[in-house]
Swiss-Prot record:
Pfam families: RabGAP-TBC, WD40. GO terms for molecular function: molecular adaptor activity. This is TBC1 domain family member 31. It is found in: Cytoplasm, Cytoskeleton, Microtubule organizing center, Centrosome; Cytoplasm, Cytoskeleton, Microtubule organizing center, Centrosome, Centriolar satellite; Cytoplasm, Cytoskeleton, Cilium basal body. GO terms for biological process: cilium assembly. SMART domains: WD40. Residues 432-607 form the Rab-GAP TBC domain. Its main location: cytoplasm. It comes from Xenopus laevis.
Length: 1089
């Protein structure tokens, strides 16, 4: 094993001697990167990725260095220094020198490996990018992180769409399916969705496995044809999904050493049609095992417990595997060396002949070489476990010989002693027949009958009408070659009418005509044999191309190279573009002479289906330049011109296609075996739509007749035209003489006309000058008039502007004055209203204070009356006749109280109604003159002062009356107390009042009297507070608890109403004066509350 240290070199050789990988390890070279300044430190490689061809790969280390390794040229180059560790690399973009690198700062950068420069910088991820998937066209990329996946356009490097998921779900991987526009997204909950990359609409979802079969997917791999998905995770089982049926069709169980799967990779094979059978499984032990998913056998493995594999990348051509090892180095493996043991031929089978008549015993006694072989049972949907077998047994199946030996010998026997199998063996050995004997071998293989008489009869019919003008359509330099081609095509057209209508027949027959131009019979029969055998079913859809044959070619291409067919479909290229041009010329346009001869050595030596296989082989062998074609014109040019091609590889590929194509699509199933031409007379060729050919023949005959008629008419026309020319010449001479006479006359007349024209011209000039002078004069007058009109218009505009300014100034002044007056009036009104509200508030406060005093006094009197009543009724408990009276008095007092309260409520409602009615009749706000308003306000103040004096006089009078009433009440209270004390002394025994209770009662009564006296003194001191509420004293003779409330507000309300009426009258007077003085002022109605 070779080891290469990159050191500080930026370029160099990968290996220094020719690598010879062993079959055990298969390592071509081990690449390490040791820092020269610190020998103990080595740079660790992190990621690696191959290009689309599979011969170059990129590798990035943890310092941000990206190296490109070219395994064909044995060279490495340092293409970029990113200064950051890379987390993912992709190297299969549509521009072959560009690559994508995902860095540790969550960004993705695009670099050019050739120019070693930055192309674009893509941001958008919030966490590290774990994978990059490129579309088959190389123009789109999907980058995946743990929380999001983003779709990028690699032409503009703009983000097209973004896939977000809940944090609880998370994304495992998002990638493109090969050969399709489908994006597969795999999430951490084992759900897998397929999306259309153009519209990003969900196409389908794979069913989530049941709990007992869940693997918690972490690794995924897809086959090249995009039909099978392998998934693995935290288990030793692998799930294989069929994406066509969207079902889990197989579960593979790995060995017991495998506990979890870290990475999955399919190993491509050039001959599996994209359905890869070898799957690489990287497990937790660092060993990557490659297994056959059909037989569940271990093919080979890489890595070991001492130096584990971290990640691996498989080349698209299946030749190399690049692995990043645990120690940071890079191993390059040769798949051919690793699978050499697998590709060895089986050991020779030694059998013993048993003379026993029993066939079964003979089979059982035969000795078999002992070869270690593990048989594994694989069933759909179940884990695959190996059978426990003892000695492996190889059973031999004896086939009964069929009675076909004679027929096969007859078929293989050729004239002149040649044998077809021997010719085929020689052809496989040398690749071609000897040039000296090629024509002889071809004649033998084609078994030409050499029917001289039949061919002469065809030649005697002459040149076919369809090919009389062949030299115009195909200008061939050699007259002999043109003549032979014309005769051969005419003979074919006379043999079968279809060949007179076939446009491509000259292209098909020309290479054989050029090859057999010295023997026209052989040339005709070779072309006829090719048409009858290798052009089977070509004319069934005439005049259209053979759709059935082209369908066979397309089916073969779809099976063996689906990617190339999809490329054709994507660019609108069908089989009539990539297959029919080759068939209709029999490869003569795309191959050189020597290549064409080698190809037809093999075509004539095999079944007629080999020609179709050769077409498919040519297309597949040219897949690389075809995949680079993007325009339909490029494809058409490619299939009509010669291209660089290894004919040997193409022929080998054709034989491979013959052997590996399934029977259902193999052309051999639909094409008949080789049948030579019959001797004596040529066979009838009528495998074409006869009515179409007959119709075209009739149409051609009709056209020929019309052409003959046209020629006769043209002959007559020419004769008439000759006579007409003769007469025309005579007429022309006479006309010339007449023209000379007319010329002389015209010359004289022209002189007269010139003079007249000169005179007329002078008059016209004079009239023109006069008209111009008149026009100038009119223009000057019009300009003067317009200037004067503009002057007048400007003067009027200025006058109008002055008037408008004056009007605007006066209106503005009037509006300002009006607004000032209105504001003054509003302010005065607001002041009056505020003053009125202030007075009302003062009155309400005073009224509230009086009401509170009266409430306190009433409460004291009520409590005192209750005590007295309680004491009195205690004294009168023995008199039962007073109980009824007490009840009646209580009821009467309650009725009187309710009556008084009802009257009070009625009065308040009436007052409120009156106030509302008066408020609704208030007049509009008007402007008042300042002096009148002040005078009226002084009058109003005087009236208010008079009313205030009168009111205070009334208040003093009522206070005097209140004092008298209080004194009278105090005297009556003293009498009642004295009376009660005397009664208590007289009847101390029956009442049985304890001393303590009596003392308590008198103390309470004394407290109530004292509080009432204090209130009386305080009310008498405050002489400025009006007393609007009065209490009627309870009569001494009345022993009931009833007392009457007289609010005493009637006189105050009447005074207030009189004051308000005077204010209204005053406002009416002011409003009438204002209307008389300013009749044009109008104010909006304003209601004040």
């Amino acid at each position: 094993m070779q080891t290469t240290d990159l050191g500080n070199k930026e370029y160099g050789k990968i290996w220094h001697r020719k690598p010879s990988p062993s079959t055990n390890e298969g390592i071509i070279v081990n690449i390490v990167h040791v820092d020269a300044s610190h020998l103990s430190k080595s740079t660790r490689f992190l990621q690696a990725a191959f290009d689309s061809a599979g011969d170059c790969f990129l590798a990035g280390d943890h310092l941000g260095n990206v190296y490109m390794f070219n395994l064909n040229r044995n060279r490495f180059d340092l293409v970029q220094k990113t200064m950051q560790a890379c987390t993912a690399i992709a190297f299969n973009l549509h521009r072959k020198t560009e690559f994508l690198v995902a860095l540790a700062d969550n960004s993705v950068k695009c670099f050019d490996a050739g120019a070693k420069e930055l192309v674009s910088w893509m941001r958008g991820h919030e966490s590290a990018v774990t994978s990059i998937s490129i579309h088959a066209s190389g123009r789109y990329a999907v980058t995946t992180s743990s929380d999001t996946a983003q779709l990028w356009d690699l032409d503009t490097f703009q983000r097209k769409r973004k896939l977000n998921v809940r944090q609880s779900v998370g994304i495992q991987k998002v990638f493109f399916l090969p050969l399709s526009n489908t994006i597969l997204s795999c999430f951490k909950d084992d759900s897998i969705f397929a999306w259309e990359s153009d519209t990003l609409a969900c196409k389908y979802q794979l069913p989530i496995p049941e709990d007992e079969t869940k693997l918690h997917y972490k690794a995924f791999a897809i086959t090249r044809d995009g039909r099978m998905l392998a998934a693995g995770g935290k288990s030793k089982n692998l799930h294989l999904w069929c994406l066509d049926s969207k079902q889990l069709f197989r579960i593979i169980q790995m060995p017991a050493k495998v506990r979890s799967v870290q990475q999955l990779e399919f190993l491509p094979d050039n001959f599996d049609g994209g359905s890869s059978q070898i799957l690489g499984v990287l497990s937790q032990d660092g060993i990557m095992r490659f297994i056959n998913i059909q037989t569940c056998k271990l093919v080979f493995d890489i890595g070991n417990p001492d130096n584990r594999v971290v990640t691996s990348s498989v080349s698209p051509n299946g030749r190399y595997i690049t692995s990043v090892m645990e120690n940071g180095s890079l191993n390059i493996y040769s798949v051919q060396a690793l699978s050499k043991e697998l590709n060895k031929p089986p050991p020779p089978l030694v059998k013993m002949v048993d003379l026993s008549k029993d066939k079964d015993s003979t089979g059982n006694k035969s000795g078999v070489s002992r070869a270690s072989q593990e048989k594994v049972r694989v069933s759909s949907g179940r884990t695959c476990r190996p059978w426990k077998t003892k000695d492996p047994i190889v059973r031999t199946k004896y086939l009964r010989p069929e009675d076909t030996t004679a027929s096969e010998d007859k078929e293989n026997a050729l004239p002149a002693g040649l044998n077809k199998p021997r010719l085929q063996a020689m052809l496989k050995g040398f690749g071609e027949y000897p040039a000296k004997y090629r024509m002889f071998i071809w004649r033998s293989l084609l078994q030409l009958p050499e029917n001289h008489a039949a061919f002469s009869s065809l030649l005697d019919k002459g040149t076919h009408s369809q090919y009389k003008l062949l030299h115009q359509e195909y200008p061939i330099k050699s007259r002999k070659l043109l003549r032979v081609l014309q005769r051969t095509l005419s003979a074919l057209a006379h043999w079968s009418a279809i060949f007179g209508e076939t446009k491509y027949l000259p292209l098909l027959a020309f290479p054989f005509v050029k090859l057999f131009q010295n023997n026209q019979l052989i040339c005709f029969e070779v072309v006829a044999t090719v048409i009858t055998n290798w052009c089977q079913h070509w004319f069934e859809y005439f005049p259209n191309p053979p759709i059935n044959i082209l369908g066979m070619v397309e089916n073969l291409l779809a099976h063996h190279d689906k990617e190339l067919l999809q490329h054709f479909i994507n660019h609108g290229v069908n089989s009539q573009v990539y297959a029919w041009p080759i068939l209709e010329t029999l490869f003569s346009e795309v191959l050189t002479r020597e290549e064409w001869l080698r190809l037809f050595d093999n075509v004539f030596s095999n079944h007629p289906s080999f020609l179709l296989m050769a077409v498919v082989s040519y297309i597949i062998s040219s897949r690389s330049p075809l995949l680079h074609c993007n325009q339909k014109d490029d494809f058409e040019y490619f299939f009509h011109h010669r291209n660089n091609l290894d004919i040997s590889n193409m022929i080998r590929e054709a034989y491979h296609l013959m052997d590996t194509s399934p029977a259902e699509i193999h052309p051999q199933r639909l094409l008949s075996d080789f049948e030579p031409l019959t001797r004596g007379q040529y066979p009838i060729f009528n495998k074409y739509p006869k009515f179409i050919v007959d119709y075209q023949g009739q149409e051609r005959e009709r056209i020929r007749q019309e052409e003959m008629e046209y020629l006769r008419e043209r002959q007559l026309t020419q004769e008439v035209e000759a006579e007409a020319v003769k007469r025309r010449l005579e007429d022309q001479a006479w006309y010339q003489q007449q023209e000379l006479l007319k010329g002389a006359e015209e010359q004289r007349r022209k002189l007269l006309m010139d003079e007249e024209q000169k005179l007329l011209h002078q008059r016209q000039r004079l009239a023109t000058v006069k008209r111009e002078l008149r026009l100038k004069e009119l223009q000057l007058l019009d300009a003067a008039r317009r200037r004067f009109l503009r002057y007048q218009q400007d003067q009027r505009k200025m006058e109008l502007r002055r008037l408008d300014d004056e009007i605007e100034r006066k209106v503005s002044l009037r509006e300002q004055e009006t607004a000032t007056i209105v504001k003054d009036v509003e302010i005065r009104q607001m002041e009056l209203e505020a003053q009125r509200r202030f007075f009302e508030q003062q009155l309400a406060k005073e009224q509230e204070a009086v009401t509170q005093d009266m409430k306190g006094e009433l409460d004291a009197n009520r409590r005192r009356a209750d005590l007295e009543e309680q004491m009195f009724w205690r004294l009168m408990e023995t008199e039962e006749d007073l109980k009824d009276q007490k009840l009646l008095e209580e009821s009467l007092a309650k009725a009187e109280r309710l009556c008084v309260e009802t009257d009070w409520k009625i009065q308040s409602l009436q007052k409120q109604k009156c106030d509302d009615w008066e408020r609704g009749k208030r007049y509009e706000e008007i402007s008042k003159l300042t002096e009148d308003v002040q005078e009226k306000e002084r009058e109003l103040c005087n009236v208010l002062k008079d009313m205030e004096t009168r009111k205070w006089a009334e208040v003093s009078q009522k206070m005097t009356e209140l004092e008298r009433e209080k004194l009278a009440g105090s005297a009556q209270q003293a009498q009642r107390q004295q009376f009660l004390q005397e009664k208590l002394r007289q009847e101390a025994g029956p009442i049985d009042i304890s001393g303590e209770d009596g003392n308590e009662y008198f103390e309470r009564l004394r407290d109530l009297n004292r509080s009432s006296m204090q209130k009386d003194f305080s009310s008498s001191d405050e002489q400025h507070v009006p007393e609007n509420v009065c209490l009627n004293d309870v009569s001494a003779s009345d022993s009931s608890t009833h007392f009457s409330l007289d609010r005493g507000r009637g006189e105050l309300e009447r005074g207030e109403r009189a004051l308000i009426s005077e204010v209204r009258e005053l406002r009416q007077k002011l409003a009438s004066q204002a209307h008389k003085k300013y009749p044009h002022l109008h104010f909006s109605q304003t209601s004040w509350s």
